[in-house]
């Protein structure tokens, strides 16, 4: 760990985690071009990557001490005064300030950006430092937008969108550790036709206009075999790489599979909802709490969409993969991902089983129709 702060126990000098280093570089670049941007943190200025900004622009970073609640209320005040605060915290410590996010920031639609470092499984940092609660909690905050980038490019893009949003709170979350290899999108889904497709023949067709909050990248797409169940794998944030690898395994098996990565996951993007409504199986993989997380939010959104549009083709089978509702033991991130079935092979197997179940249900429906 190296030298630590005697009060917080955090490293005095930030380790060169890939995600944190990219944030540190990008926030300096953004601040150079926008004098409204100011960094705020709670006794973790160096570990979260705000030190380079403080070194270059000392008056543009405020460390409020071990006071996350104050950091959020203070940032709301800065936003009301015309600034755009970027509050950088460890994800687990945002739990302390949920009331302030809800009542001081979101209620007033304050343009505050919250950057959550060490989101998801942190492993050897211990049970208290797993940043697994944020998405399940923040999904219930009206008007809030949350991004979960998959790599360096999408992290930079999400930060640019976040600091340009002045009428709502934005959150950008990423895990501890090295950046994964970049994944190039084949195409992007966009907000399109409102009616669900009969026969579930295609995931979704592109349309030319899409809000930044509705961006969904298609990472892998294989054509469906006749009569086979269509599988949609949704990789949330850094889990997109595992979802992509699982999609490759399913493709080798001859399954019809599409792998997507939504840049912003709260609220569920409209193109993702319509895509999920058009398939037989949806598997959502997230580095966070399963109960109430992104998979749960997407499932509810699909049900509402189908009810609103009178869909008659049946609901997709949902499988949610992530962190169970428990305090997580101290272990390596790799070991915990294996324990929770979050590796590519586990994801592929869960999708296969769900596809078998969907095929059986479809056969039963056909027999009843006769």
Predicted regions and their residues:
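Thiamine diphosphate
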Residues: 1-26, 32-55, 63, 69-71, ...
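Extended, hydrophobic alpha-helical segments in both membrane/secreted and soluble proteins
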Residues: 49, 61, 68-88, 97-101, ...
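Short beta->alpha connector loops at strand-helix junctions that form conserved
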Residues: 64-65, 89-90, 148-151, 285-287
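Short beta-alpha junctions and helix-cap segments that line functional grooves
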Residues: 100, 158-159, 271
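Conserved glycine-bearing catalytic or ligand-binding loops at nucleotide- and phosphate-handling centers
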Residues: 148-165
């Amino acid at each position: 760990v190296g030298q630590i702060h005697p009060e917080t126990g955090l490293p005095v000098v930030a380790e060169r985690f890939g995600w944190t280093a990219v944030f540190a570089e990008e926030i300096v670049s953004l601040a150079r071009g926008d004098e409204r941007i100011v960094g705020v943190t709670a006794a973790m200025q160096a570990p979260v990557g705000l030190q380079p900004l403080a070194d270059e622009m000392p008056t543009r970073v405020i460390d409020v001490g071990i006071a996350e609640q104050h950091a959020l209320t203070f940032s709301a005040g800065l936003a009301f005064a015309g600034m755009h605060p970027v509050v950088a915290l460890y994800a687990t410590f945002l739990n302390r300030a949920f009331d302030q996010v809800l009542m001081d920031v979101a209620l007033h639609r304050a343009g505050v950006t919250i950057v959550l470092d060490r989101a998801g499984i942190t492993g050897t940092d211990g049970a208290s430092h797993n940043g697994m609660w944020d998405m399940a909690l923040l999904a219930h905050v009206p008007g809030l937008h949350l991004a979960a980038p998959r790599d360096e490019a999408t992290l930079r893009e999400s930060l640019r969108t976040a600091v340009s949003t002045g009428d709502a709170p934005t959150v950008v979350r990423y895990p501890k550790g090295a950046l994964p290899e970049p994944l190039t999108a084949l195409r992007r889904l966009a907000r399109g036709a409102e009616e669900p497709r009969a026969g579930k023949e295609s995931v979704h067709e592109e349309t030319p206009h899409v809000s930044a909050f509705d961006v969904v990248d298609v990472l892998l797409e294989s054509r469906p075999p006749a009569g086979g169940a269509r599988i949609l794998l949704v990789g949330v944030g850094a889990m997109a790489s595992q979802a992509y690898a699982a999609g490759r395994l399913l493709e080798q098996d001859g399954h019809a599979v599409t792998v997507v990565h939504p840049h912003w996951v709260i609220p569920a993007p409209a193109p993702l909802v319509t895509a999920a409504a058009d398939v037989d199986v949806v598997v959502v993989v997230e580095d966070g709490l399963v109960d109430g997380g992104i998979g749960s939010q997407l499932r509810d959104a699909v049900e509402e969409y189908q009810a609103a549009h009178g869909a008659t083709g049946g609901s997709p089978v949902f499988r949610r993969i992530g962190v169970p509702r428990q305090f997580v033991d101290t272990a390596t991130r790799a070991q915990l991902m294996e324990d929770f079935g979050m590796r590519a092979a586990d994801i592929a197997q869960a999708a296969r089983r769900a596809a078998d179940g969907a095929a059986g249900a479809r056969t039963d429906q056909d027999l009843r129709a006769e």
